[in-house]
């Protein structure tokens, strides 16, 4: 796993108390089988967020952890969780919630990989399949960890199909999305929390953490340890950020075709703001003999799974998506992100461009800007204290 430790070391954190920093995984006193899984997964030494947050999670305290995309946040809470659960018991002990089915499934895979030598039983509980399927799988093998979406998990709780009596850890991944107002998850999170034991530990994780979200966490967290990246450290250093002033919406497509012809692309994600735009752009590019796949929330789950599988394996190189793909999905070969539309929610900018340059790799983000988008881009630059440069005339210099 290629990882830029030099860039990772530059990160500066604000913490609510002085923390012990663990320089190695061995210094965390982890289970032997968990260590085997960590090294088997490809980790050599903990990243900045891992060296600070894992031991806090293991200690049982509530934790709020923020770090850049691609620095190992998922492994941070997964390692802490796997260390904490009792493998002798086969009942549900840890619950991970995330905003999309794809992310919930990816987290479940990380749990399986890191827990490969522990015989841990985990399950991805998402929409798109029947509750009977969920029940049959869990009853057959037992289930110590559930990674799911809030709606499906809450439904299982309300039907008394999940026993929450021994749940000792609740993890909210991409917490700004789960606790924000835009997608309607917040009330579901509150309802889930009321069905968990009073002593349940809560871990909140995200790449962005606004003051409003931190305020919301006070309702269900008890004196949490906060590990937050300083604002001017949030931008992703390994990613070159550019814009193309297309002036008019109608000129975006021709600009995209020109880029397509000029750049050498390993894999690319193109973001649009609406499902309708994704379908339109996918059809338009296909008509122009460009090989693309697309994904958004209205697609059937089996179709979304097929798109993800093909993209991960490299069978498809260009994916067009809404923000459903901006959150935490890790495909390491992605080298280019194109914002066909500037994101409507400011925080989604960092999540989108974080799909390139995963775990210290170099990446490129290109933003298509109409005249009416210029003020939005200036707001993004001001908010993240970054400079988005015009695309150079010689495109070979940006790859």
Swiss-Prot record:
Sequence motif DEAD box, residues: 173-176
Primary localization class, coarse: nucleus
Gene3D superfamilies the UniProt entry points to: P-loop containing nucleotide triphosphate hydrolases
The Helicase ATP-binding domain, residue ranges: 54-227
Pfam (any one): Helicase_C
GO biological process: maturation of SSU-rRNA from tricistronic rRNA transcript (SSU-rRNA, 5.8S rRNA, LSU-rRNA)
InterPro entries: DEAD/DEAH_box_helicase_dom, Helicase_ATP-bd, Helicase_C-like, P-loop_NTPase, RNA-helicase_DEAD-box_CS, RNA_helicase_DEAD_Q_motif
CDD domains in the cross-refs: SF2_C_DEAD (cd18787)
GO molecular function: ATP binding; ATP hydrolysis activity; RNA binding; RNA helicase activity
Binding site for ATP: 67-74
Motif (Q motif): 23-51
Catalytic activity: ATP + H2O = ADP + phosphate + H(+)
EC assignment: 3.6.4.13
Keyword Hydrolase in annotation: yes
Keyword entries, A-Z: ATP-binding, Helicase, Hydrolase, Nucleotide-binding, Nucleus, Ribosome biogenesis, RNA-binding, rRNA processing
PROSITE patterns documented for this protein: DEAD_ATP_HELICASE (PS00039), HELICASE_ATP_BIND_1 (PS51192), HELICASE_CTER (PS51194), Q_MOTIF (PS51195)
Keyword rRNA-binding found: no
Cited function: ATP-dependent RNA helicase involved in 40S ribosomal subunit biogenesis. Required for the processing and cleavage of 35S pre-rRNA at sites A0, A1, and A2, leading to mature 18S rRNA.
Name listed for the protein in its UniProt record: ATP-dependent RNA helicase FAL1
Gene this protein is translated from: FAL1
């Amino acid at each position: 796993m290629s990882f830029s430790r030099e860039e990772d070391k530059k990160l500066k954190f604000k913490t609510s108390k002085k923390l012990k920093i663990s320089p190695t995984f061995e210094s965390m006193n982890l289970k032997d089988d968990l260590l085997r899984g960590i090294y088997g997964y490809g980790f050599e030494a903990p990243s900045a967020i891992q060296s600070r947050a894992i031991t806090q999670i293991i200690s049982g305290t509530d934790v709020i952890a923020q770090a850049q995309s691609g620095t190992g946040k998922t492994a941070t809470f997964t390692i802490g969780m796997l260390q904490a659960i009792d493998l002798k018991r086969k009942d549900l002990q840890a619950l991970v919630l995330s905003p999309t089915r794809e992310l919930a499934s990816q987290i479940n895979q990380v749990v399986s990989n890191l827990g490969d030598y522990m015989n841990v039983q985990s399950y991805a509980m998402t929409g798109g399949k029947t509750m009977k399927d969920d029940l049959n799988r869990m009853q057959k093998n037992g289930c110590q960890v559930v990674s799911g979406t809030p709606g499906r998990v809450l439904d299982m709780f309300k039907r008394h199909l999940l026993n929450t009596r021994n749940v000792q850890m609740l993890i909210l991944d991409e917490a700004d999305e789960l606790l924000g107002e835009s997608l309607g998850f917040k009330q579901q999170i509150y309802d889930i929390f009321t069905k968990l034991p009073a002593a349940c530990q809560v871990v909140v994780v995200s790449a962005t953490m606004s003051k409003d979200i931190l305020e919301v966490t006070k309702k269900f967290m008890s004196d949490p340890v906060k590990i937050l990246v300083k604002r001017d450290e949030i931008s992703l250093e390994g990613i070159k950020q550019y814009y193309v002033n297309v002036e008019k919406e109608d000129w975006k497509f021709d600009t995209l075709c020109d880029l397509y012809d000029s750049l050498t692309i390993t894999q690319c994600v193109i973001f649009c703001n609406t499902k309708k735009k994704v379908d339109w752009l996918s059809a338009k590019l296909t008509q122009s003999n460009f090989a693309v796949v697309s994904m958004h929330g209205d697609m059937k789950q089996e179709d979304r799974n097929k798109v993800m599988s093909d993209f991960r394996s490299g069978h498809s190189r260009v994916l067009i998506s809404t923000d459903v793909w901006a959150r935490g999905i890790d495909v390491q070969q992605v080298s280019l992100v194109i914002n066909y539309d500037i994101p409507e929610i400011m925080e989604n900018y960092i999540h989108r461009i974080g799909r390139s340059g995963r775990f210290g790799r170099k990446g490129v983000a290109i933003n298509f800007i109409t005249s009416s988008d210029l003020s939005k881009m200036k707001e993004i630059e001001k908010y993240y204290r970054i400079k988005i440069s015009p695309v150079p005339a010689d495109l070979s210099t940006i790859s």
